[in-house]
Swiss-Prot record:
The keyword Transmembrane does not apply. Catalyzes the conversion of 4-hydroxy-tetrahydrodipicolinate (HTPA) to tetrahydrodipicolinate. Keywords: Amino-acid biosynthesis, Cytoplasm, Diaminopimelate biosynthesis, Lysine biosynthesis, NAD, NADP, Oxidoreductase. This is 4-hydroxy-tetrahydrodipicolinate reductase. PANTHER family: 4-HYDROXY-TETRAHYDRODIPICOLINATE REDUCTASE 1, CHLOROPLASTIC-RELATED (PTHR20836:SF0), DIHYDRODIPICOLINATE REDUCTASE (PTHR20836). Its main location: cytoplasm. The active site is at residues 157, 161. One of its GO terms (cellular component) is cytosol. The keyword NAD applies. It comes from Acinetobacter baumannii (strain ATCC 17978 / DSM 105126 / CIP 53.77 / LMG 1025 / NCDC KC755 / 5377). Pathway: Amino-acid biosynthesis; L-lysine biosynthesis via DAP pathway; (S)-tetrahydrodipicolinate from L-aspartate: step 4/4.
């Protein structure tokens, strides 16, 4: 698409929503809409003032349906139930979506897959360029080490995060499991307590830390005899996630209807490991 994409932000009043508004402005794209819950006291507020960048002439709306016609693409970092409703509206209108909502159920993910047969959808647990490059490195490490190491995923986030493990940790685990020909649902071990017995090398362990204002940290350990390799990504602010999501929004407009991920956006699927 040659013209600057018209981008709508859902959950505009949240921390991520405000950062997304800033990212749209920094990228030079058009903020076409900002949406909050209809009962929110922020409805009617200038979206730019809300995000701390000054007036942009876009008022926060309490209804996605009312502003959808003004948008080429919607960015949604809200909650699973809300995202499911937004998908239905965007599917009917043929408006592209970029979804960063985590904690979705298998049923909700199936609904997303179905909607993506009607309108293009980018879905990723993490839109950071660094995280997605890290995942490519994890695939390489898993391919080289194979079954000769124990694998542990450790993630840390702020005290307000409600889902665990993080979507990014699971995304990393899935990438490793797929590379090794394992089913993550069968081999994942979430935390350990009591007499657990010897470790099964086929398993992939997950540990979760919640506290303070940690934006997001992920470390994957490939632990062998006499050595270990660690791949770590640390986010110090939310702008890297927001900038990646805005990049995905500009990329997906005009694409054929299907589900994409950040590896598609960044061209990482073309990089062989």
């Amino acid at each position: 698409m040659s013209a600057a994409p018209r981008i709508g932000i859902l959950g505009a009043g949240g921390r991520m929503g405000r950062t997304l508004i800033q990212a749209v402005q920094q990228a030079g794209y058009q903020l076409a809409a900002a949406v909050e819950r209809p009962e929110s006291s922020l409805v009617g507020t200038d979206a730019g003032e809300l995000a701390g960048i000054g007036s942009v002439g876009v008022k926060v709306s309490g209804s996605l349906a009312d502003v959808l016609k003004d948008c080429d693409v919607i960015i949604d970092f809200t909650a699973p139930a809300a995202t499911a409703q937004h998908l239905k509206l965007c599917r009917e209108a043929g408006v592209a979506m970029v979804i960063g909502t985590t904690g979705m159920s298998d049923e909700q993910k199936a609904e997303l897959d179905e909607a993506a047969t009607h309108t293009p959808v980018v879905y990723a647990a993490n839109y950071s360029v660094g995280v997605n490059v890290s995942i490519k490195l994890l695939e390489l490490a898993a391919k080289v080490f194979g079954d000769t190491v124990d694998i542990e995923v450790i993630e840390a986030h702020h005290r307000h995060k409600v889902d665990a493990p993080s979507g990014t940790a699971l995304m990393m685990g899935e990438a490793i499991a797929d590379t090794l020909g394992r089913n993550l649902k069968e081999v994942a071990v979430y935390g350990r307590e009591g007499h657990t017995g010897p470790r099964d090398r086929q398993t992939i362990g997950f540990e979760t830390i919640r506290g303070g204002d940690i934006v997001g940290e992920h470390t994957v350990m490939f632990i062998g005899e006499g050595e270990r390799v660690e791949v770590t990504h640390k986010a110090t602010n939310r702008m890297n996630f927001a900038a990646g999501a805005v990049r995905a929004a500009a990329w997906v407009v005009g694409r054929e209807a299907r589900k994409y991920d950040m590896k598609d956006v960044l061209g990482l699927n073309d990089v062989q490991v």
